[in-house]
Regions:
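Conserved catalytic-core segment of nucleotide-activated headgroup transferases in glycan assembly
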Residues: 14-22, 148-222
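A donor-sugar binding/catalytic signature common to diverse glycosyltransferases
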Residues: 71-74, 88, 235-281
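Short, well-ordered alpha-helix to beta-strand connector turns
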Residues: 57-58, 83, 108-110, 157, ...
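Nucleotide-activated donor-binding/catalytic signature segment of Leloir-type glycosyltransferases, i.e.
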Residues: 220-235
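Leloir-type glycosyltransferase catalytic cores
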Residues: 146, 279-292
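Active-site and donor-binding regions of nucleotide-sugar-utilizing enzymes
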Residues: 4-145, 165, 251, 256-258
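Short, surface-exposed amphipathic charged segments that create phosphate/polyanion-binding patches used
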Residues: 145-157, 243-253
Length: 292
C-alpha cells in the first residue's frame, strides 16, 4: 500500500521521518516549511508533490499538525473527501484540539498516534470519538540509539545550551495576544541570562540555539544587554551534538529539553515567575525559581 506523508513543522517531521526510516517505508511526500530540511537531513532529497496528488495517489496518509500552516489541516479535509484513511502523529503535549480547527471548522483524522502515556491520556481526554494509538516516539527511539552509540557525554564542559522556541508568535496566532501565557521568548531568555549566576557559580559559555522556524538573528539583542564574550548563537551542529557538548540545558517548553533528559543532562525551565508553569510533564525538569 502506498503511504502519503505530509508535514510542515519540525516537531512532527522529526517523529514521522524517524518512523518512515524505522519501518523502511518509501512514501509519497507533501512537505513544506521546516519539515523539508528535517526529512532531507535524515533521508535525502525529497520529491515533493502537490496536496491533491498526494491524497489521490496514496492508499492512506500519515501527517503531523501545525500551529501556523494549514497544510496538514487541508490534507485531512481532502482525505476525508476522497475517503482515504488519514492518521495524525501528534508531537508535544499541548494545544491538541486547536490543531484541528481552522476558521471555527474542526477537521479530525480517522486515527491519532501519540508517543507516550502522557500524550495518550491528553489525547483520549480531548478526542472521545477518535481512535488513539500509542506508538513509542520514533524520534526519541532514534535519539536513544544514537546515545548508546555515542555514549552519554558526562564531560564537564562548563557550558549552557539554551533552546529557543517562537512562543510570542504562537500565542498571538492562536489567541491574539503575544503574552497570552504570561511571557514571551525574549522575556524568558532575559530572565535566564539575568539569573545565570544563581544557577551556577561557575562561569560558563552560553550557547543559544534558535528554533528551526526562527530567524538566526532573532536573538542578536542579547549581545547589547549582556556580556557577549560568554554568549554565542549557534545552530550549525545537530541538536544532539549541542546537548552532548553542554552540561546544563535550559529553555521554556521545547522538545529539545526532553532529548536533554534522555542524555542525562540537568534541564531547567526558564519561564519567568509571571508565566504559566512549564507544560512538559517530565518531573526531571527544574525551574530557575528553584535557585532564587
Amino acid at each position: 500500500m502506498k503511504v502519503g506523508v505530509c508535514c510542515h513543522d519540525a516537531g512532527a517531521a522529526e517523529i514521522i521521518s524517524s518512523y518512515v526510516m524505522q519501518k523502511n517505508i518509501f512514501p509519497l511526500y507533501c512537505l513544506s516549511g521546516p519539515a523539508i530540511k528535517v526529512f532531507e537531513r535524515k533521508i535525502g532529497t525529497i520529491d515533493n508533490i502537490p496536496l491533491l496528488d498526494i491524497v489521490k495517489n496514496s492508499d492512506w496518509l500519515l501527517c503531523g499538525t501545525s500551529w501556523k500552516s494549514d497544510l496538514e489541516w487541508n490534507v485531512i479535509k481532502e482525505a476525508k473527501k476522497q475517503q482515504k484513511k488519514i492518521i495524525v502523529f501528534l508531537d508535544h503535549w499541548v494545544n491538541y484540539r486547536e490543531r484541528f480547527i481552522r476558521n471555527n471548522e474542526e477537521c479530525l483524522p480517522d486515527e491519532i498516534w501519540v508517543g507516550d502515556h502522557y500524550a495518550e491520556k491528553i489525547a483520549k481526554d480531548n478526542f472521545l470519538n477518535v481512535k488513539i494509538k500509542l506508538i513509542e516516539n520514533p524520534y526519541l527511539l532514534d535519539i536513544k540509539e544514537q546515545l548508546l552509540r555515542l555514549g552519554k557525554s558526562r564531560v564537564e564542559s562548563n557550558s549552557f545550551l539554551y533552546v529557543c522556541e517562537p512562543i510570542r508568535e504562537h500565542a498571538y496566532f492562536q489567541h491574539g495576544d503575544e503574552r497570552y501565557w504570561g511571557y514571551t521568548e525574549e522575556e524568558a531568555l532575559r530572565y535566564f541570562l539575568t539569573n545565570i549566576n544563581e544557577i551556577s557559580k561557575v562561569k560558563r559559555l552560553v550557547v543559544i540555539r534558535p528554533h528551526p522556524s526562527e530567524d538566526f538573528n532573532k536573538y542578536d539583542w542579547v549581545f547589547d544587554e549582556f556580556n557577549h564574550k560568554d554568549i554565542k548563537i549557534d545552530n550549525k551542529k545537530t541538536l544532539l551534538e549541542q546537548i552532548l557538548g553542554s552540561d546544563i540545558v535550559a529553555g521554556c517548553e521545547s522538545m529539545a529539553m526532553v532529548v536533554a533528559i534522555l542524555a542525562e543532562k540537568e534541564v531547567i525551565s526558564s519561564i519567568p515567575t509571571d508565566g504559566r508553569p512549564c507544560v512538559l510533564p517530565h518531573k526531571e525538569i527544574g525551574s530557575i525559581r528553584d535557585y532564587l
